[in-house]
Amino acid sequence: LENYPAPLSPSLQLLDAQDLQASRDRSLLLLGGYLGFGLLVLFLGWVHVRLYGDRVFVAYVSYVACMLGFQVAFTGLGGLFFWPQHWVWNDTAPALFMLWLTASGIWFVREVSALQRHSRTLYRLATFWSLFGFAYPALYFMFLSPAAFKLLNLYGLLSVLLSMGLCIWAWRKGEVHAGWTALGFLPLHLAYPFPALRSAGLLPDSWATQYAVLIGSAIEIPLLLYILHRRAKDFNENSARMRVSDSTDPRTGRP
């Protein structure tokens, strides 16, 4: 068995027909539940876009959409149900959505950390890093070499470190919700090494390498939405207090 450009790390199991069918049923139930939950969170995120008109929610919705696309492609659900006849797309979709997921994640971090207000250098770095992730699939599929695959994995690893670093830096600058966002990312970042090590050929294919990111993201995306909801609510309350203060006579306390 050979796979290109990613190494193949199969694990062998002996199952009878009944056990195989039971395993398939459990997997489909898990994936179906995840997809339905993810679509619900995506809808709620879009409601917040319409409600608050904040760019951070647009970035969040893009991040969740790419996450769902990645999970559908990576777990094989897409090839089984959504595009069974399109084998070329089935082969390219996991890498494409992985890069777009990472790029949209950095875009989301850029917005939630308010980098433009604190450091134009870091703002430009995050912008460039995100744009690179959106554009790199064109180069990756053009060359499709082991070197291009290593660069893809390196981009994913460095993006994990960059996202946490930017959130913690912004938190120390006074962006309280950036610190909470760093904690919200933890479930996914702790799950990331399992598929990454499998892609590098260091771990065999297993339940953990297949579903760790799915479980991590199922915890992460509602946490991030709640953090963003609290952020928007706090900003609105602060804006309301400032409007009242500006319209009040400081000597009499009356409008």
Model-assigned labels for residue ranges:
Residues V56-A59, W180-T181:
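Alpha-helical transmembrane segments and their helix-entry boundary regions
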